[in-house]
Curated annotation (Swiss-Prot):
Keyword check for ATP-binding: no
UniProt-listed Pfam families: Gp_dh_C, Gp_dh_N
Function, in words: Catalyzes the oxidative phosphorylation of glyceraldehyde 3-phosphate (G3P) to 1,3-bisphosphoglycerate (BPG) using the cofactor NAD. The first reaction step involves the formation of a hemiacetal intermediate between G3P and a cysteine residue, and this hemiacetal intermediate is then oxidized to a thioester, with concomitant reduction of NAD to NADH. The reduced NADH is then exchanged with the second NAD, and the thioester is attacked by a nucleophilic inorganic phosphate to produce BPG.
UniProt protein name: Glyceraldehyde-3-phosphate dehydrogenase
Enzyme class: oxidoreductase
Entry EC number(s): 1.2.1.12
InterPro entries (alphabetical): GlycerAld/Erythrose_P_DH, GlycerAld_3-P_DH_AS, GlycerAld_3-P_DH_cat, GlycerAld_3-P_DH_NAD(P)-bd, Glyceraldehyde-3-P_DH_1, NAD(P)-bd_dom_sf
Pathway as given in its UniProt record: Carbohydrate degradation; glycolysis; pyruvate from D-glyceraldehyde 3-phosphate: step 1/5
Tree of life domain: Bacteria
Gene Ontology CC terms, in alphabetical order: cytoplasm
Keywords for the protein's UniProt record, in alphabetical order: Cytoplasm, Glycolysis, NAD, Nucleotide-binding, Oxidoreductase
Length: 332
């Protein structure tokens, strides 16, 4: 049976996952709630500077955007509790405004009639986080869940493969992350993060991230063993994780690469990738895998200390796994 989905917040992630959902037979987007008018929503969906023109026929009226003749209801309601999820028989709401990251806030979608809620960002309280390749199998029917962050979706599968095979002692992660909509194009005020207010096009900007710590929440065996930071860089999309890790079971870099390659073909298929090509970031634009290991970019100091590199499209890969989580929560 098709899962009826409503999207609250039609920003970068909302639009990318909408495009991806059009390729899936198990998910149907029924409604979008955003403060933008249907005309502007249709325009932003059709034309995208990063992912190109959307190859569907798009029109609109005062209450809908229309994709290949199919109406998708559009509303502009600020309070999630007042949304019409019940009237539209919505099974799962994707909460992608970036604003409602606490249980009490996300629960308003349940009060409005949705059966389940998937939050597209790391939760700010006890909303459980689920990452494909890490802990999807532990889902027990919770009504409100988080898909964590794009960086956690890259780091967690890689960390699990290393920990399962070699036993992680401790590690530090750096993500070299593409610019996002929260940054300033030129220098501007950012009271909570002074460096974050500097011009995104002109600077490499050090930043904090909870992505590595969040791995310990989806993989409890790694709790307290990983932490990390970010550099925001002037590219529009695609990011890369640098995981420097110490592990128990001695192994050469080649042996580690072999285990990662095997995992990408078996238990991590559809999640992790493996490449020995001379790749750069734009080669992964539009990639739905969330962690593509770059064998030629990493190195080892000895048989217990290694640097591992994995690429990810921080928009497409993450959005793909949000839809996988929607599919998961609809079944229990």
């Amino acid at each position: 049976m098709t899962i009826k989905v409503g999207i609250n917040g039609f920003g970068r992630i909302g639009r990318v996952l909408f495009r991806l959902a059009q390729k899936r037979s198990d998910i149907e987007i029924i409604a979008i709630n955003d403060l933008l008018a249907p005309e502007y929503i249709a325009y932003m969906l059709k034309y995208d500077s990063t992912h190109g023109v959307f190859k569907k026929h798009i029109t609109f009226d005062k209450d809908n955007i229309i994709i290949n003749g199919k109406n998708i209801r559009v509303t502009s309601i600020k309070d999630p509790e007042k949304l019409m999820w019940h009237d539209l028989s919505i099974d799962v709401v994707i909460e992608s405004t970036g604003l409602f990251l606490k249980r009490e806030q996300a629960y308003k979608h349940i009060l409005a009639g949705s059966k389940k809620v998937v939050v597209t960002g790391p939760s700010k309280d006890d909303i459980p986080m689920f990452v494909r390749g890490a802990n999807f199998h532990k889902y027990q029917g919770e009504s409100i869940v988080s898909n964590a962050s794009c960086t956690t979706n890259c780091l967690a599968p890689l960390s699990k493969v290393i920990d399962d095979n070699f036993g992680i002692i401790e590690g530090l992660m750096t993500t070299v992350h593409a610019s996002t909509a929260t940054q300033k194009i030129v220098d501007g005020a950012s009271d909570k993060d002074w460096r974050g207010g500097r011009g995104a096009l002109q600077n490499i900007i050090p930043s904090s991230t909870g992505a590595a710590i969040a791995v310990g929440k989806v993989l409890p065996n790694l709790n307290g063993k990983l932490t990390g930071m970010a550099f925001r860089v002037p590219v529009s999309n695609v990011s890369v994780v640098d995981l420097t890790v110490r592990y128990k079971k001695s192994a050469t870099y080649s042996e580690i690469c072999q285990k990662i390659q095997q995992a990408s073909q078996k238990e991590m298929k559809g999640i992790m990738g493996y490449t020995e090509d001379e790749v750069v970031s734009t080669d992964f634009n539009g990639e739905e895998l969330t962690s593509i290991f770059d064998a030629k970019a990493g190195l080892s100091l000895n048989k217990n200390f290694v640097k591992l590199i994995a690429w990810y499209d921080n928009e497409t890969g993450y959005s793909s796994k949000v839809l996988d989580l929607v599919s998961l929560v609809s079944k229990k």
